[in-house]
């Protein structure tokens, strides 16, 4: 009997359940054995790395020359203010860049709602706290917003001519991705008498600049476009794909020694029970700076090395560590 491509099991349309305003669960079934892991892992990686978004990339603050400047009347240090600015969920409706401003006077909290925008820019989480003024003082900022995708550390985004850039212009690590978290699980599915089938369940959470369903559609379009280049083959060798044993990216299971950090940085991380890349990327910059003997120079090194691999800090991972992993290595 001749088997054609059209006879390969095709899933029904996805079932979408909106869990919160920015989070949704998508169920796709039935799938042939192994297809759920193949599709789930591919979609997860595209969702986290390739969905376009906007982020604040440069900041100028009156009276601030660098990120370690102390500002009188400001409760937070400048470094913490920059970290808070990175979490502002912002959307540019047209164009690739925008310049915004923030001015606040008097004691009190400064939020994203204090950023002055125009009709082309929209701030989603306007209640997000940026800093606190402790006395009757003022803070004046100029913010540059850009569109992009993925995570781009400041050390990677600086151009060679940036040494002559305006004094006081602070370049931020930019997390353009509007997708905050993606997890998938595979369950058994059944169609009539067939029980050797898969069900794919994807849990997606965004920052609100794009809804979860639209993010998934965009990821599927990207994958379709990438795979379309194979459509010109006159002969197709349909080899089998071995299903992944889990939904965890294999890169995250690699030890931090693979990052080739300096001995000092590596030892500081291991002293805090950070043994895998998956352990490391879940830490925030503030948490790492609290690590004994790990200073700003080591933090910069870690961010640069992760950035070269398309990774960043402050990532939320579901079900970590996965089964079979301990702080001493892979379990048999």
UniProtKB/Swiss-Prot annotation:
The N-terminal domain is essential for RNAP assembly and basal transcription, whereas the C-terminal domain is involved in interaction with transcriptional regulators and with upstream promoter elements. It catalyses: RNA(n) + a ribonucleoside 5'-triphosphate = RNA(n+1) + diphosphate. GO terms for cellular component: cytoplasm; DNA-directed RNA polymerase complex. The keyword tRNA-binding does not apply. GO terms for biological process: DNA-templated transcription. SMART domains: RPOLD. This is DNA-directed RNA polymerase subunit alpha. The keyword Transferase applies. DNA-dependent RNA polymerase catalyzes the transcription of DNA into RNA using the four ribonucleoside triphosphates as substrates. Residues 248-332 are annotated as: Alpha C-terminal domain (alpha-CTD). Homodimer. The RNAP catalytic core consists of 2 alpha, 1 beta, 1 beta' and 1 omega subunit. When a sigma factor is associated with the core the holoenzyme is formed, which can initiate transcription. Keywords: DNA-directed RNA polymerase, Nucleotidyltransferase, Transcription, Transferase. Pfam families: RNA_pol_A_bac, RNA_pol_A_CTD, RNA_pol_L. Residues 1-234 are annotated as: Alpha N-terminal domain (alpha-NTD).
